[in-house]
Amino acid sequence: MRILLTNDDGINSKGIILLAEYLSKEHEVFVVAPDKERSATGHSITIHVPLWMKKVFISEDVVAYSTTGTPADCVKLGYNVIMEKRVDLVVSGINRGPNMGMDILYSGTVSGAMEGAMMNIPSIAISSASYESPDFEGAARFLISFLKEFDLSLLDPFTMLNINVPVGEIKGWKLTRQSRRRWNDYFEERISPFGEKYYWMMGEVIEDDDREDVDYRVVQQGYVSVTPIHPFLTNEGCLRKLREVYESCTE
């Protein structure tokens, strides 16, 4: 396959370099990744300033570029400019830390893959589910075996897979739902060396989803979480309920 690889941790991160090395053994790999850390940039794109791109070396078998853009920018550039719209798979990662629950709305990693899905290209975001001790090697090995096993043609149009890999022994993988995992934010007030006040965002994770088949619960049990997601955010159940009440009011 012709694979477009990106991330949000930057072109020099261990996760993307290792994944490029593994994937290039069996596939034609093109890397287009940010030139610096772009975590939590969500699905932002660059429209008011130029995008710069520079060819870099990762290995003899990989074509690689760094850009001044976001992960979504990288996929747009890779698809339209570098790979001339001939892409079989978009992979974003390997992220340092999990992308589960409401994380996915902030995640540059997920947004890189979602950009591919919005082009109707099979796309995967992959994360090692530990920020402190990520296992990039284990996540890379899992993805290689998963690609041999999983039939990407079964994905609905405009749908991607969000994969979170536990650290340590992997018992297998399970199809999951996005959880309601979220953060309770608070801000620490600090004083700069110039005597000016600034704020540093902190947070405590909330994991109170009692459903068994959600992403973080499966990862906590030692399984890889594989969640199909798409960019269409309409709450269909709520829409039906509201129409029952208000449809007559709008006629």
From Swiss-Prot:
Protein origin, superkingdom: Bacteria
Native organism taxonomy: Bacteria, Thermotogati, Thermotogota, Thermotogae, Thermotogales
One Pfam family matching this protein: SurE
Enzyme Commission code(s) on record: 3.1.3.5
Gene3D superfamilies: Survival protein SurE-like phosphatase/nucleotidase (3.40.1210.10)
UniProt name for this protein: 5'-nucleotidase SurE
Keywords linked to the UniProt accession: Cytoplasm, Hydrolase, Metal-binding, Nucleotide-binding
KW Nucleus (keyword) present: no
